Amino acid sequence: MKRTIITFILLLFVFTLHSHPWKPSHYVIIDTDGGIDDMRAITMLLASPDVRILGITTSGGALSAQNAYVKVKSLLNSLYHEGIPVGTDTDGRYRMKEMPFALQTVWGNEDGIDPINAPDNLSIISGLISAEKTKISFVCLGSMTTALRALRNIPDFSRQVKEIVWSADESGYLNGFNFKIDKDASEAMLKQEIPFRIVRSMSAQQGDLYTDELISALGKVKTPYAARISSFFNNEVSKSHRFSYFGTDEMVAVFLHYPSLFVNKANGIISESTPADPEGIRESTIRILKGETVQRNQVIKDLPQNPGFYYDDINPSVNEIISRYGIDEWTSGVLANELHRHLGTFAIIGVKMGIRAREYFNTGVDEFTAVSYAGSTPPLSCMNDGLQVSTGATPGHGLLTVRNDTILSPSVEFTYLNRKIRLTLKPEIANKITSELKEINFIYGLDSNIYWELVRKNTIKYWRDLDRHEIFEIEPLL
């Protein structure tokens, strides 16, 4: 009996390991003061599948906490990461004179963003710490104000936060800009027991991070994150300011991924990391913004992007689909239709919906639960196949539930870190797809090859033409 119990426990352990093939190396909460280098560092961290940004808080420094909040929300909204929670320092202490360049810098569309009713930093941090069981890195791109408030007011902060990662000037953290924003908080935090990793900026002797070669290379990277930073350098004001080219807070993003590019010196719980390989750092910046920080697949290294690899009818649309919607949607679409054993419109809708939900929360696969109201009757239920491939939420992982006991609809509820949203295919699109399928079924019948040829043709059309950012209604539930 004892041997049987031990065997059962070992099997459970093995199954647990296989249910999550890999997790991000870093779960982070970021505190920012709204500097231009903060925008670039945050964008790099958003780009990497090896980092999970749980939330972002804002404090005074380069900008007021409230203006920094507006900048952060505009960036997240423009990248379709609306579900990342953002807080601000509602106390409003330690206000400095704002930097005009930081205030002028565009992070995203600021229309409709009001910091007046923004949640307080502490409520954001407390909620995330209670929801996420993995140890967290608290990344400070500005002052120590928020970190100290959290340490003093959130009992689990010191237990759940494994390290403070702090951006510092090239000469070190003492008397640097971030240190001086709130000197009292800086001194108090350096005396507490959570390990400190202080990451210095690139030195003047090492040259600019953003050389002409790097800026040119950024323009060729086909991700929204690289495009965001590339667009910064298309602005005449940005190009005319010397600070634009320095490697400052971006070093935190590089250090988290590639610490070997830095010289690390430790003194007790405080370690300082100094950039040591400028060219390696530039190459790593490109790699991070490409999202090439982990292997995403389990069996194949990469799916071919060469149109010639695919059948003639889809061949002309390959480049356009990848260019418009990204490699993740393309890969998920290919795999979903192979799983589905035919090109299906609702399967592609499921792919697009799953990618959109992951975008919203900025998650990887296997990270949220999904409840589908598409039922188990084709063609609507075909949506579930696309959903599984694009999100990793499968019945085998215990992450997907398909409801058949209610009114069926192209709608799915996603829950992540105690937050829930509902995505629904817009009625006019759902009705058009359903009407087309009914019509060709009525004319040709399911047993006709012509029926499946027309379904295939329509699926390619919808895959190419339907933008996942425009076809779904998103309703926050929790």
Each language-model region and where it sits:
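Sec-dependent signal peptide recognition
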Residues: K2-F8
